[in-house]
């Protein structure tokens, strides 16, 4: 065995033995190593706090954020709704807003290729679909276009687009806008959609009975048939009334009806109505409105004249208008009948013309008043009162207050003539005796003026004395009588006095007859002894009787005073000859202040 060379002999070699020894050693040590690894699994040493608390807070914060995000997703349906919570936040945007694609009017959806679009009408089940406040029959093929119209985002925009497609002109160019549906107007422009020809023909007869002028056209389009009407009703109507009446007459949906007043000051609009009325397919009834004639007819254009101030002054004089605001308002109302008033409205100096007109009317009226005697003035006031009455309430009132009628007539006779020392009548007594009611009615009938001591601080408070036939000083107090005793003794006498008028030099006039009401008995107060001989006093003792309705039993109007002066003309020394212009030789031709034309014969 020893002779064999190492590594060449049979049996176990040295390599095998060495591997076997290594294998045996490792197998013996494996149990010990496994137990050691298990023992090292548990750390029995003292542990420190570390960052566990910070980790806990981070986890709680993340969980809270997740819950809040879930709530936001639950209660906010879209990002746009979230922006509505904060208008300022919604206004802030980094990316530009995308424009929504504009939809075409009555746009037909594209066919998918399977023929479903062609069978849409036949496959639709019968029923009604509510759009807004109106129910539309879906099964009706003619109403599908109306349904598409009502489902649009802007109904009026679609209606206007269809109108322009049919007539080639914008609806807004022919009409003006009324903000309120309650505003009334006789002229209306009406556009109706999806109407049948038999309904249009039947409505013509009905419109002739309720309208003075009718203009009707109908034109078909790819979307619907559009009917255009311009009507003038016999009375003014509001938009609500017109829409309700037209929808009932044409069996149309209110949402498919446009009603607006026409543009009456637009020449292109007037030319459109005038030219369209001559088409063969247009139905017209009645005479065209004046706003169409005025802007289209050559004769009407030639009749346009310049504004004449004298004609305006004559109109105000004939109607007894002296106040500027009243002149402006009443003259503007006659613009539809008077070309001169229409020219005044077109003028840029309306306010100046009104002031000039009022000034001239006051001048003419004042000169006319001064040219008449008191008797003529009283008869003029009687002639201009159309109603007839009786003077019984006046006599009963004086008798109830203890005033003798004969004494009152004698004092009034001297008062009307302005005799010195008898130019002022004073009515005094306790309150509620009817002093102001009685004297105010007389001043109103004689068209006198009222002066108030409240304006005594002004230099012009007595200016009405120069512009009236009679004046009234109502409710004179102690301060008033002191002022009269100091400064107005000459006025009480009925003598001439100087009055300071505004924008004029002091004017010398004779003080007109004056009425005074007061609660002070001037005759019993020696303080005003110099006024005792200048006034005629009537004591009213009893309170004015009141009926169950709270009104005074005695009423005094213009017709009562007219009967008073007519019945008592002889005791008052009112001459009938002075009252009748024909008897006293005066001319009966009315006053004329208009400029004469070139064709007037001299």
Curated annotation (Swiss-Prot):
Binding-site list for ATP = 429-436
Q: What is its EC number?
A: 5.6.2.4
Provide ranges: composition bias, Polar residues. 111-126
Q: Name one GO molecular function term.
A: ATP binding
Write out the transmembrane intervals: none
Catalytic activity reported: Couples ATP hydrolysis with the unwinding of duplex DNA by translocating in the 3'-5' direction; ATP + H2O = ADP + phosphate + H(+)
Give start and end of each SF3 helicase domain. Answer: 403-553
Q: Which domain of life is it from?
A: Viruses
Q: Where in the cell is it found?
A: Host nucleus
Q: Where is this region: DNA-binding region?
A: 138-304
* Region (Disordered), start-end ranges: 1-66, 78-126, 573-602
* Job of this protein: ATP-dependent DNA 3'-5' helicase required for initiation of viral DNA replication. It forms a complex with the viral E2 protein. The E1-E2 complex binds to the replication origin which contains binding sites for both proteins. During the initial step, a dimer of E1 interacts with a dimer of protein E2 leading to a complex that binds the viral origin of replication with high specificity. Then, a second dimer of E1 displaces the E2 dimer in an ATP-dependent manner to form the E1 tetramer.
Quote the subunit structure annotation: Can form hexamers. Interacts with E2 protein; this interaction increases E1 DNA binding specificity. Interacts with host DNA polymerase subunit POLA2. Interacts with host single stranded DNA-binding protein RPA1. Interacts with host TOP1; this interaction stimulates the enzymatic activity of TOP1.
Task: Name the family.
Answer: Belongs to the papillomaviridae E1 protein family.
Protein's name according to its UniProt entry: Replication protein E1
Species of origin reads Mastomys natalensis papillomavirus (isolate African multimammate rat) (MnPV)
Gene name per UniProt: E1
